[in-house]
Amino acid sequence: MGACLSAEQSHDTPEYKRSKALDRRIKEDEKNLSREVKLLLLGAGESGKSTILKSMRIIHHIPFTDEERENFRRLVFLNLVQGMKTILDVMEEWSIDFQDDSNIDHLLLFVSYPDISEDEPFPTNYLVALKDLWLDQGVQSVYRRGNEAAVPDNMSYYYTDLDRLFSPSYIPSEDDILRCRNKTTGIIETTFPLQDHVYRIFDVGGQRSERKKWIHCFENVTAVLFCVALSGYDSCLVEDKDSNQMQEALMLFDSICNSKWFARTSMILFLNKVDVFRQKIAYSSIKHYFPDYDGDDQDFNAARSYFKARFCRLNRSVNKEIYPSFTNATDVSLLKIVMASVTDIILTNNLRDIVL
C-alpha cells in the first residue's frame, strides 16, 4: 500500500510530465500534417512547369526579392545570347547563310559571352549584334523552324523589346520573369499558405537526366500536377533532337499515372501553352506528327480535345480520376481561375481520404 501513488500525486512526476508533453507534441504534429498539402510538379522538359510555379507565387502574393530579380536580370541576358547561339549553331549545321554578309562580324561575340556582374548593364555591343542578327532572314528562317531545333519559344517576346532590356536601369518585370527560362536541376520547393492549409510544391527537373531524382519526393504526396506543353506536338526535345516532345510527355505521363507510388494520388493534368498551340496549328499540321488525329488541323477545340483524350486514356485504374485543365502559364489571370478549381479538387479528395 505504501508504495502506491494517488492519481493526483502521479501527475507531479517527471515521467508523467514528459509523457503529456510528448502527447501534446504528437497531436500538434498530426494537426500540422493534416493542414499540409504536398504537391509534386512534374512534366517533361519545356512543359512550362517552372513558369507555373512562378505564376503561383504571383497569384498568392509571394513577391520576388531584389536578389531574385537581379538573378533573373542576368538570366534574361543569358536567354538572349544562348537563344541566338542556338540559332547560329543550327544555321551552320543546316548550311544556311546570312542574308547580310556583314552579320558574320558578330559571330565572335557568341564563341563565349561575359558573366554579367551584379547591377552591371548588359554590354551595348551585344545590343547592336542581337538587333542585326534578329532582322537577318537567315536567322528568321531557322527561327520559323524552331520546333526542329529546340529553339526557345521566348525569343520573340524578348527580341521585340531589346532597347528596354539593355537600359542601364532595367529591372525585370513579372512578365519578363515568367518568360525567363532556367533549366530546373534537382528539386525546388515553394511554400505558401492558402485556406487554412500550407501548400508545399516541389518542382522537379524535367529533362531525362533529372528524373531519377523524383523518387525522393514520392512519399505522402497529396496530388501530382503534371504539366505538358500542347505546343510540343511538333517539337523535338532539347536533349534529343530525334524525339518528339509530345510523345515523350505521353510516355512519361503513362509511367507516372500508373505508378504504384501514385495509386491513391490525385492527378491534375495541365495541358499548357494553349496560346502557342493555337498559333502553331495554323501552319503546322497535327496529322503530320499524329496521323490518327481525324479532325481539322486548324480546329483549336477539336485539336486540344484530341490531346486531352490521348492523355486521359492512359489511365489504367478504374479508381483514379484525371483532372485536366487547359492552361497558359504566362497568363496569371487564367491560371488563377484554374488553380481555384484545382484547390477545390485537392481539398475535396484530401477530405475524402481522411474520412475513408
Curated annotation (Swiss-Prot):
Q: Where is this region: G4 motif?
A: 268-275
Q: Region annotation G2 motif: residue ranges?
A: 176-184
**Looking at the record, which segments are called G3 motif?**
199-208
Q: Molecular function (GO) terms listed?
A: G protein-coupled receptor binding; G-protein beta/gamma-subunit complex binding; GTP binding; GTPase activity; metal ion binding
Query: Lipidation annotated as N-myristoyl glycine: which positions?
Result: G2
Q: What is stated as this protein's family in its record? A: Belongs to the G-alpha family.
Q: What is this protein called?
A: Guanine nucleotide-binding protein alpha-2 subunit
